[in-house]
Amino acid sequence: MDILLQVNPFSSVCGFICHHPCESECRRKEIDSPVSLRQLKRFVVEHTKEHRVQSRKKAASTTGKKVAIIGSGPSGLAAAKDLALLGHQVTVFEKQQVLGGMLANAIPRYRLPLDALHEDIADILASGVEARTGCEVGKDLPFDQLRSDYDAVLISVGLAESSSLPIPGVESKGVLLGIPFLWDTANGFAPEIGDRVLIVGGGNVAIDVARTAKRLGPSTVYMACLESRKEMPAWKWEIEEAEEEGIVIMNSWGPKAILHQDGKTCGIEFKRCTRVFDENRRFSPQYDESEITTVEVDSVILTIGQRANLEFIKGTPVAVDGGRLVFDRETLKTSEAGVFASGEVITGPGSAVQAVATGHNAARVIDHYLKTGEVMKLEPTTLETIGELPKKTADKAKKFDRVEVGLSAAAERVKDFAPIERAYTESEALAEARRCLACATGAVLDPKALCAGCLTCVRVCPFGVATVDQTAFMPAQECLTCGLCAAECPAAGIRLGRFATNNMKEGINLILEKMDVSRISRPFVVSYCCLYETTSRKYLRPQTEKEIEESGILRIMAPCVGRLGSLDLLAPFELGADKVMVIACKEHGCFYTGAEELLGRRIKGVRQFLDELKVGQNNLLFFPTTGSAEESWPQLWEEARKAAAQADAAQSGS
């Protein structure tokens, strides 16, 4: 949770509404489908609420600099938190009575419950950010005064107003604008829309408007847009969900006139749109005026674009051109020194997580400006990438279905504004997390290792990744971190960047050296358990000393017991264990092809060695999980302890 909040102060919000661009980059998609990162993050957020509250801490104002932020959407508040943590005194000015901007006042509640937003805002305010709600800059407080009172100003007002259309009939009763419609509905003032409603627009806001309208009870809701189905700017899954709810989408139609009778809307006339963009992808619609259609409706909601209300800077040195704020993309500065901008007011319509990103950038340039008096250019963010997963590797990987929670039934969800998607259960989250390939953390040859080029790694790699040219080499973009080469390497020279098991002895010793080993119930069993078989956090939590003493079981969770090397299997005996158990996945259930067979061979070899040491091969036990870990493991532990007790009794009797 701490990691999530470091990069995204709106982690709760994004758990519900993020369009998850990270998933489209997930290399798991080359095997089956991407890991559900949004749902996993939501699970983390929803199960760490107490920790989150306890971790809140006010940052000290150490720089003596004051920053004013106009607008409390995700960009403004993200910048506010960053600047507060950097030691600046930050005040957010919001003309509405609540913080959150469009998140609080326009995003439908079926998509974003207010509780999630309030959690994020509480974190931000706890960092030391001051908020003045119900204060409209330009009306309650002149912009020039604000500028003189603060060392820097950030304009982050978003795009809170809807654009209209210059067509006949647009002034008729029953013609509404999309953003005000969402705003009124979210705040409990839903307008009368009649039995038949048509939304003009094809973007995500239009989808929100259509689905919101559907929940107000009309029998028919239409969406009409210039774009073809493939060209619609709305996200694919939003379009599909809207259609599931009965929204009728009319593609490639442009509004020609709104029809009315006695001043009241009664229909809308369309002309066929034959092209939306020209050859340079500029908006340049063309129509076939000979193809006309008319739809009878009681109301029309226009959702064809958004704009910012910049009246508060009218007559100030902050330049506006054609209704748009003038700013420098490299520095985010406006035409007035010390005044910067972020969020949709400069980027245009986007997602919450994109707005957060511009807020982070704004905080960086403002912090630099306050400390140096100079304007900093934002360098393009370049992240090191590992490249696509090669097909030859993907084809050899086991497929595991993505864990989908699905939505509530369409017929039920349109009845109210209750959230339509539940979170993962604990078992679902663990199952989905297991699908992660741990990219770029795979096998690497220790430069100090005495690699003999024996080809063991080549023989055991289930993905055909390892190669040997004098020494072993595992390409990072191909390795899927199974760890089998590390477990089998006779020189013990291969390391894993993540999930390594070559320090098991050290880990067990750290636990035992804090205990009075003589108090542990005998026989003392060290049990290596496959982490991937857990369906709850029960066995992911560290054991207490009392639990170990009373049960006689020290549980060691291994991320795939197939990674355990021979030394890992022997180490517990050296540290005083009477028995060692290895509990693997269900039969044929291992994530990695061949891991079970190789582990079995390893155990056989160690057992022979135990006989030679007079320890006895029967003291190394191997079991597959027979059901859920929570049900089967205690039974297996009990069996092992009983068998050990019987063996000890028999030995004493002889």
Where are these regions (language model features)?
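Flanking helices and flexible, charged tails adjoining ferredoxin-like Fe-S electron-transfer domains
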Residues: K41-K66, L103-A104, P108-E130, K139, ...
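FAD-site-proximal beta/loop scaffold in flavoenzymes
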Residues: E171-G194, D278-P349
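Glycine-rich dinucleotide-binding loop and its adjacent helix/turn
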Residues: V44-A60, A122-K139, S162-L216, V320-S335
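Iron-sulfur cluster-binding cysteine motifs and their immediate structural context
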Residues: M1-D2, G15-V44, T91, K95-V98, ...
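N-terminal Rossmann-like FAD-binding beta1-loop-alpha1 element of flavoenzymes
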Residues: K66-T91, A206-K214
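Rossmann-like dinucleotide-binding cores of NAD(P)H-dependent redox enzymes
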Residues: V92, Q96-S127, A131, W183-T185, ...
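A conserved FAD-binding loop/helix module that cradles the flavin
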Residues: V209, S342-G373
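N-terminal Rossmann-like dinucleotide/flavin-binding domain of flavoprotein oxidoreductases
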Residues: M1-N8, G15, P21, L40, ...
